[in-house]
């Protein structure tokens, strides 16, 4: 006749270990060392039971942290490149006001920010409200840029962060830049308060060169 099979539950094992450790009513350092053993056993049990989950969580958190660091570094580098290129554009074009616009969220383009500017701000724009302006994707400037073409106008200024007319602007010229995903990501724009400006052929050359560099940094 086979002997009856005896099984132990995890709780039986746990209480058995605790009974062995604390049955002699030890105090002081002995008790502290035994408590440390219990804590260590508890941690080991959790790791053994949920080891895969903890490891996956650790990998995910490390990846997210790494991605955030990379994104911050990329953003800082892009802003530095944008300011550098804008200074070249502003001086070369002899514009009165120049700006680099950047769309967000990435590849969705719901809002536009001025991330760098040179020259005198138009009277309708406040330095405190250069970001978060909604993008109207039906505007001529946006649709022209989507096709990779440059845009110029003496009356329509799609991305200026204001709903008020800006009569002091007599002319604007802009070109798009595309990010590494080849998605329209923003514009480089020059404005003139006076009637005279250099030729569009020259502006096209100035703007296109800066747009290529910004695209590689974005």
Swiss-Prot record:
GO terms for cellular component: host cell plasma membrane; membrane. Residues 1-34 are cytoplasmic. Signal peptide: none annotated. GO terms for biological process: viral release from host cell by cytolysis. Disulfide bonds join 175-207. One of its GO terms (molecular function) is pore-forming activity. The chain crosses the membrane at residues 35-49. Keywords: Cytolysis, Disulfide bond, Host cell inner membrane, Host cell lysis by virus, Host cell membrane, Host membrane, Membrane, Signal-anchor, Transmembrane, Transmembrane helix, Viral release from host cell. InterPro entries: Phage_T4_GpT_holin. The keyword Kinase does not apply. Residues 50-218 are periplasmic. It is a single-pass type II membrane protein. Homomultimer. Heterotetramer composed of 2 holin and 2 antiholin. The holin-antiholin complex binds dsDNA. Interacts (via C-terminus) with antiholin (via C-terminus); this interaction blocks the holin homomultimerization and delays host cell lysis. Interacts (via N-terminus) with the lysis inhibition accessory protein rIII; this interaction stabilizes the holin-antiholin complex thereby resulting in a robust block of the hole formation. The C-terminus serves, in association with the antiholin, as a DNA sensor for lysis inhibition under superinfection conditions. Belongs to the T4likevirus holin family. Accumulates harmlessly in the cytoplasmic membrane until it reaches a critical concentration that triggers the formation of micron-scale pores (holes) causing host cell membrane disruption and endolysin escape into the periplasmic space. Determines the precise timing of host cell lysis. Regulated by specific antiholins that somehow sense superinfections and then delay lysis. Participates with the endolysin and spanin proteins in the sequential events which lead to the programmed host cell lysis releasing the mature viral particles from the host cell. This is Holin. The gene is t.
């Amino acid at each position: 006749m086979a002997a009856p099979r005896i099984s132990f539950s995890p709780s039986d094992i746990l209480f058995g270990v605790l009974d062995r450790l604390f049955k002699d009513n030890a105090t002081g350092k002995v008790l502290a060392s035994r408590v440390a053993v219990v804590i260590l056993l508890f941690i080991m049990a959790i790791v053994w039971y949920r080891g895969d989950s903890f490891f996956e969580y650790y990998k995910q958190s490390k990846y997210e942290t790494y991605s955030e660091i990379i994104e911050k570094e990329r953003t800082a580098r892009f802003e530095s490149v944008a300011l550098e290129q804008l200074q070249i554009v502003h001086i070369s074009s002899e514009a009165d006001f120049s700006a680099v616009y950047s769309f967000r969220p990435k590849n969705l383009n719901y809002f536009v920010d001025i991330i760098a500017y040179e020259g005198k701000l138009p009277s309708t724009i406040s330095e405190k409200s250069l970001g978060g302006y909604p993008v109207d994707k039906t505007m001529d400037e946006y649709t022209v840029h989507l096709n990779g073409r440059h845009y110029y106008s003496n009356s329509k200024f799609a991305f200026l962060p204001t709903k008020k007319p800006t009569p002091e602007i007599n002319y604007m010229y802009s070109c798009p830049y595309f990010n590494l995903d080849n998605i329209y990501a923003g514009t480089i724009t020059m404005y003139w308060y006076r009637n005279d400006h250099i030729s569009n052929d020259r502006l096209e050359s100035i703007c296109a060169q800066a747009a290529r560099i910004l695209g590689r940094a974005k």
